[in-house]
Amino acid sequence: MDINARNIATPTATGASSAPVSTPAPVVGRFAPSPSGRMHLGNVFSCLCAWLSARSQGGRIVLRIEDLDDRCKRPELAAQLIDDLAWLGLEWDEGPYYQHDRLDLYETALRKLQDAGLTYPCFCTRAELHAASAPHASDGTPIYRGACRGLSAEEIARRSALRAPATRLRVPTVDDLADDVVEFVDRTYGARCEALATECGDFLVRRSDGVFAYQLAVVVDDAAMGVTEVVRGCDLLGSTPRQIYLQHLLGLPTPHYAHIPLLMSADGRRLSKRDRDLDLGELRTRFGAPEALLGWLAGQTGIAPDATPRSAEQLVEHFSWDVIRAHRENIVMNERAIMQQTAARPDERLDSDIVKASTTRLSPEGFDAFCETLDSPMPEATKKLLERKAAWE
């Protein structure tokens, strides 16, 4: 399945041409964050790249809050996320839309797949899937080998009485050579292809708890919102063939895909909300102004030539996909460097290891006693940071 023959407009080289040139469709990008916690630096980088790419092409941005999962149904975090984007100066032109308001659209799409005989109930548990020691897809999920694909109606009824099934989408078998392979061109990582039967397997479109799967929801939403360009972290590169296959089945257009490198911690971990890596609340306090944060981030990731404070608008002229392609390896972000970069004066520069070691022993009540043990007055910026960290314990 070669998507380049379907609804995909590829950029043309500049230069003279005698052929008539049609006006390209306007670019529509999107922010699609999940309110499962405060944004971290990696989330900011992803949103920044999506915004810069759309704006550099005269395009628009749609904001969609992906809150299908129970852990994401937190209005206060969604409101904080929206406030953070506004503070960064990453304005959007449409939205915010909330996925929890769009369940009827996902239900309609799923029913279309079911009516075509493309889905089946799956009773396998997560533990069973991992215990099977199956090969894993490019996104780390086990490749499903079809244990429930051929269940009889009687067996489905018997198992359904015991537990609710998930719903899986059938992918072409290895014998369906014309449709088995999905090909696409990623704006950063180039030509990609995946054999669905051997590298992906039948995948979920609805979980056993009734929640629609990410793959189905984003495909429906991107089409409904007119999204023509998807910019996101390279950890989602492996999801793209599944989404393209769903677009093909549902008769939906395929956007351009552009995956960007991940920001990593110094110990090799991907930055995450769960691990409480530096979030935007702390970054806003330390950098003070959005221009300082965005300029520093642009300098660290190669978007700009240096870390000079710049607004999002000022970074548009520096943005180039050629630069992203040249720096497509994952980028290590050093927390100590951030602490030092944002210190107001030399005597306020912090050793993040000391900060962490101290705050693990502190309660808010014990903070003043800790300050009294110091040989000299604590700089105000340091004191504020430690107070906040102590309150988290």
Give the positions of each predicted feature.
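Non-catalytic terminal extensions that flank enzyme cores
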Residues: 1-37, 61, 157-158, 174-176, ...
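N-terminal Rossmann-like or analogous alpha/beta NTP/dinucleotide-binding catalytic cores
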Residues: 2-138, 234-235, 239-252, 309-310
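Generic structural signal for secondary-structure transition and capping sites
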Residues: 90, 118-119, 302, 324, ...
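Active-site cores that bind ATP or allylic diphosphates and position pyrophosphate for catalysis
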Residues: 127-273, 279-284, 335-342
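Short, basic amphipathic alpha-helical segments that act as recognition/interaction helices
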Residues: 344-358
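Short linear interaction segments
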Residues: 359-393
